[in-house]
Design a protein with these regions (language model features):
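N-terminal, active-site-proximal structural segment of metallo-dependent hydrolase catalytic domains
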Residues: 1-59, 69-83, 284
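Active-site beta-strand/loop signature of hydrolases that rely on acidic residues for catalysis
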Residues: 3-8, 30-50, 123, 142-169, ...
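Short catalytic/ligand-binding loop motif for oxyanion handling, primarily in non-cytosolic enzymes
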Residues: 11-14, 47-50, 73-75, 132-133, ...
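Surface-exposed cleft-lining segments at the edges of enzyme active sites
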Residues: 12-15, 125-137, 194-195
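Structured beta-strand-rich core segments of catalytic domains in phosphoester-bond hydrolases
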Residues: 44-128
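Conserved beta strand-loop-helix elements of the APE1-like EEP
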Residues: 76-97, 116, 209-214, 240-259, ...
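Short proline/glycine-enriched turn/loop segments at secondary-structure junctions
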Residues: 76-77, 235-240, 267-272
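Metal-dependent phosphoesterases centered on the DNase I-like endonuclease/exonuclease/phosphatase
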Residues: 139-246, 251-254
């Protein structure tokens, strides 16, 4: 069983962009290439899922479960952020064994809970806030509380907007001189969206510690390899090399079933058209 996650920058809906990279049909081709049994998409689409996407994924054998973010208004209710949706897909052959629920984290944003009875597995799909470490921590606390009630093996997939505190890259970004220098740069270039400051906060590592240090979860990728690039929506002239790891697959399995995880199968995919790289893991 292959389980995957990929932040696709709302590319399953059609809206005007400055560039034409990775339209909905390109994302569908990428999904076919990855060939997951279960896959989660933060920022799947805004407003409306493209009809051709529904048809194409149905032909590929998938059931689609879209869930609206319903996030508290943080000033971004325009363009690709308007009526933003999460999406979980799974193969039709698992239909009789799977139930999908919507959960609420920190009364801020929805997340998805997939329960696979046959495989004694719960898969959470989450997208933690990208603007506030405080909100990320509260969302992580809620996720820890909700998941602690489950007896099954657990995977948490998604875009955490958070790095591990032990990651050498986050250590560099937490260096006081480096941090001050980047903040000065942000002011100099009039960084109105606080992209630099927000990235620095993602390096604090405190949100992930709620789940790892306090919640007993571990990251599938202990090497902490990067998953995001600068080649983001409307800035696709920027390079595609990977910079930071904020997409994670966390796990909590019991001692007997830990052998189900094929750690060597963990994969970070090539550039498939988003600023995030898709990631996947196989279960035996």
């Amino acid at each position: 069983m292959k389980i995957a996650s990929w932040n696709i920058e709302s590319r399953l809906s059609r809206y005007k962009m400055k560039t034409k990279r990775a339209q909905p049909e390109d994302i569908v081709r990428a999904i076919s290439f990855i060939n997951p049994d279960i896959m989660f998409f933060p920022e799947a689409f805004s407003n409306k899922l493209d009809n051709k996407v529904k048809e194409s994924l149905d032909e590929l054998g998938y059931i689609l479960v879209p869930v609206p973010y319903n996030h508290k208004d943080d000033g971004r209710v325009w363009g690709e952020f308007k009526n933003l949706h999460l999406l979980m897909i799974y193969k039709k052959e698992f239909k009789k064994d799977i139930k999908v629920n919507t959960i609420r984290l920190a009364d801020f944003r929805n997340a998805i809970e997939l329960v696979d009875k046959k495989n004694n597995l719960v898969v959470y799909g989450v997208h933690l806030d990208d603007r506030s470490e405080k909100v990320r921590i509260e969302m992580a606390k809620d996720l820890k509380r909700i998941s602690s009630k489950r007896k099954e093996d657990i995977l948490i997939l998604g875009d955490y907007n958070a790095m591990h505190k032990e990651d050498w890259k986050s250590k560099v970004l937490r260096n006081s001189l480096v941090r001050k220098s980047f903040l000065v740069l942000g002011k100099a270039i009039a960084d109105k969206d606080r992209i630099i400051a927000r990235t620095l906060d993602m390096a604090l590592g405190t949100a992930l510690e709620v789940l790892t240090k306090d919640g007993g979860f571990k990251d599938i990728d202990q090497k902490m390899r990067s998953t995001t690039t600068l080649k983001m929506r409307d800035h696709e002239f920027l390079p595609s090399f990977r910079l930071t790891q904020i997409d994670h697959i966390l796990y909590k399995f019991n001692k007997k079933s830990i052998k189900r995880i094929d750690f060597k199968s963990y994969k970070i995919y090539q550039d498939l058209g988003s600023d995030h790289r898709a990631i996947s893991i196989n279960l035996k």
